[in-house]
């Protein structure tokens, strides 16, 4: 167990119990760290040092200036929850999964390392809009999780290649072959 000692004067509890007045009188700064079983147990403080500490604490608890800010600067407006249609509904262009979608997907057995990209969401929405099926919001999220899982795993977890890119030939000649 790590600990921080806040004074350079360290004594054992036996010494403090034997003559605490002498120990505190010899201390620098009016404070002594008391150890029991080679571990810090508590601090012994002189009455004068305790008065200093209490005065300092009281001073720090008062505001540094008499300028008070309006309460509006401290109060943040509550975010209006996104309206999720009740019951079953057909997919629509502005549909979004919940903010904690990744956590929910993990509960359904779909571990998504990264959040759903805008492209994945757009492809999902476009497909299901054309289908015209109706499901509950949670069912749409489950379908999205499975869809993303399947699309990501179909390429070995790698992002899909751009079909418009021109591939570069490998010009490296292995050892033992003539080029």
Curated annotation (Swiss-Prot):
Cellular component terms (Gene Ontology): primosome complex
Region (C-terminus): 84-155
KW Oxidoreductase (keyword) present: no
UniProt region (Disordered), positions on chain: 151-179
GO biological process: DNA replication, synthesis of primer
Disulfide bonds: none
Pfam (any one): DnaT
Biased composition (Polar residues): 151-168
Keywords linked to the UniProt accession: DNA replication, Primosome
Domain notes: The C-terminus (CT, residues 84-155) forms a 3-helix bundle.
Family the entry assigns: Belongs to the DnaT family.
Function: Involved in the restart of stalled replication forks, which reloads the replicative helicase on sites other than the origin of replication. Can function in multiple replication restart pathways. Displaces ssDNA from a PriB-ssDNA complex. Probably forms a spiral filament on ssDNA.
Assembly behavior: Homooligomerizes. Interacts with PriB. Component of the replication restart primosome. Primosome assembly occurs via a 'hand-off' mechanism. PriA binds to replication forks, subsequently PriB then DnaT bind; DnaT then displaces ssDNA to generate the helicase loading substrate.
Protein name: Replication restart protein DnaT
Origin species: Salmonella typhimurium (strain LT2 / SGSC1412 / ATCC 700720)
Lineage: Bacteria, Pseudomonadati, Pseudomonadota, Gammaproteobacteria, Enterobacterales
